[in-house]
Amino acid sequence: MRYLSEIKNKQITVLGLGVTGLGIVRFLVSQGLTPTVVDSRINPPGIDWLKQNTPTLTTRFGDLDSADLCASDMIIISPGLSLTIPAIAKAINAGVEVIGDVELFARINTKPVVAVTGSNGKSTVVTLAQQVLLAAGYKAALGGNIGTAVLDLLQSDLSNNDVDVYVLELSSFQLDTTTSLQPISATVLNVSEDHLDRYASYQAYIDSKLSIYNNAALVITNADDEATHSKAKSQLSFGANQGDYSLGEYQQQTYFMQANKAFLPVTSLAVVGKHNYLNALAVMALLSPFNISKAQYSTAFSQFNGLAHRCQFVAERAGVKYFNDSKATNVGATIAAIDSLATNGQQLIVIAGGDAKGADLNALTPYLQQHVKALICFGKDAKDLMALTNKSHLTNNMSEAVTLAKQLSEPGNIVLLAPACASIDMYNNYMQRGDDFIQCVMAEQP
């Protein structure tokens, strides 16, 4: 709280009035601060809340160049805004401090933080980690890039002392404006090409992810993904066949292994698939600083049913199973989904497409050749996907794609929506895309 006193008389600008920006404003106002609110949009999403609750705050909506950001002592920026935007870059060059909501949280918070980033699996890992902590009796708050904004969580804790530990999902965009976070444990789950429309290079994206390790008491790396590795002195690893936490055989069953000793059978986890087992191993490594029993893990694992749009089972029709992995917005996620569902030699019919955001799609090719019976494509970069295999088909929309998938399938096949692309060319978000897939599947006659 002392930090808030230190900045009370500073000229603070909140830049961006979406969900995150509104959370920043709410928090600052609740602590007696009066920020200026700036957004490039004339009517940003949070404008009605401002008018009703903080009508006296100074606001500047419209052209950022006219907002005079250089007059600020500090800018607290929403993660959706790039630091390379000319007006923002000008302020940075003028010496204005630019931070994000996670950085403000880190400067005030005194409770332990478990921090998770990665190209894929973040939401599943943090949700499962919270459930394990709750089963062990900890008051665990989940937020960041999922659910509740970090400053809303912090405000609740400052008022009610209702948090023992924070479990935070953090995007690379959030990490770019965060330097003070000191997690009790932190991981980069995996890295695959994504957001290359925002970063100058793939390495710049990797470096952004790896910054989560800075100041972490314990670093958790993926033994199977060299891009996640660290030179930190205090670290553990997880992996399919290697690492401190891994998968192994014991008494003719596959087990979660801890230091090569059988811990729990993978059947203790309610969701199936290699990617889910790896997520569980990551959780075990992340939570190693906490006192959690095998029974408490078993309880949480058995009650975890996964998240919507993440390899979500939709239906079985005429012996064909349909899975919705609309959250697979990059190549790595689609590979993980194919690899997980094709474990018993099933032939997959994959529906993919959307905006690839400049990513290299070629890593998909061996998986398409080995496990995929047909690749059905639509969306902005459909033709780039089609070039990967001679088993590809072009459609105009989700309805056509699902209908064609039904025609091409036979009993024992799996139809998988795993787009390998963002949804923004045709949908508001990946959830809307996944819901469209589900509706199309359910509309097909069995």
Swiss-Prot record:
Gene3D superfamilies: Mur ligase, C-terminal domain, Mur-like, catalytic domain, NAD(P)-binding Rossmann-like Domain
Metabolic or biological pathway: Cell wall biogenesis; peptidoglycan biosynthesis
Superkingdom per UniProt: Bacteria
GO cellular component: cytoplasm
Catalytic activity: UDP-N-acetyl-alpha-D-muramoyl-L-alanine + D-glutamate + ATP = UDP-N-acetyl-alpha-D-muramoyl-L-alanyl-D-glutamate + ADP + phosphate + H(+)
GO process annotations (BP): cell division; cell wall organization; peptidoglycan biosynthetic process; regulation of cell shape
UniProt xrefs under Pfam families: Mur_ligase_C, Mur_ligase_M, MurD-like_N
UniProt binding sites for ATP: 118-124
EC number(s) stated in the UniProt entry for this protein: 6.3.2.9
Residue intervals passing through the bilayer: none
Molecular functions (GO terms): ATP binding; UDP-N-acetylmuramoylalanine-D-glutamate ligase activity
Subcellular location: Cytoplasm
Entry keyword Translocase: no
Leader sequence segment: none
SUPFAM superfamilies (alphabetical): MurCD N-terminal domain, MurD-like peptide ligases, catalytic domain, MurD-like peptide ligases, peptide-binding domain
Keyword line: ATP-binding, Cell cycle, Cell division, Cell shape, Cell wall biogenesis/degradation, Cytoplasm, Ligase, Nucleotide-binding, Peptidoglycan synthesis
Class of enzymatic activity (EC top level): ligase
UniProt cross-references to NCBIfam families, sorted A to Z: murD
Homology family: Belongs to the MurCDEF family.
Task of the protein: Cell wall formation. Catalyzes the addition of glutamate to the nucleotide precursor UDP-N-acetylmuramoyl-L-alanine (UMA).
Designated name of the protein: UDP-N-acetylmuramoylalanine--D-glutamate ligase
Annotated organism of origin: Pseudoalteromonas translucida (strain TAC 125)
